[in-house]
């Protein structure tokens, strides 16, 4: 599973997350992987009234969770089990407009995967809308190549 030339499927990455990081599904805002390709990962956060903040919009922490999850899924898709030890070192998110009361969609793109770092960009949308509601950039620390198997 850790062969970097082979990209994992949605099912394979979902199984890795379920087996090694099940707490991501606890609490508010259930997330899932919709599509996993070499150049883009699409993740979804199902609409959940518990993540709606005063004013009727999705909370910032919920949008951050989805963006971070999408990048992690993209890294797992690229690195396989070797990516399990990857950790967020930085994420900057700009909230651009109010999301609709619907599922949130994240489109993550790995801009660079190096020896020690992965850099990604994420755009968040309300389901059914082309308007970007948030934009994030993220840096992940990767395990040393010797530990990647």
Annotate each predicted stretch with a short phrase.
Residues 1-44:
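Non-catalytic linker/capping segments at the edges of enzyme domains
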Residues 2-8, 97-101, 105, 111-149:
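HotDog/MaoC-like acyl-thioester-processing domains
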Residues 29, 39-41, 60, 85-91, ...:
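A generic structural signal for short beta-strands and their flanking turns/coil linkers
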Residues 38, 48-52, 69-72:
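Short, charged/polar surface micro-motifs in flexible loops or helix N-caps
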Residues 45, 67, 91, 122, ...:
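Conserved GNAT-family N-acetyltransferase fold
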Residues 47-56, 63:
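A short interface-forming secondary-structure element
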Residues 61-81:
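Active-site helix/loop of acyl-thioester processing domains in fatty-acid/polyketide metabolism
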Residues 74-105, 110:
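Hydrophobic beta-strand-centered segment that forms part of the acyl-chain substrate-binding groove
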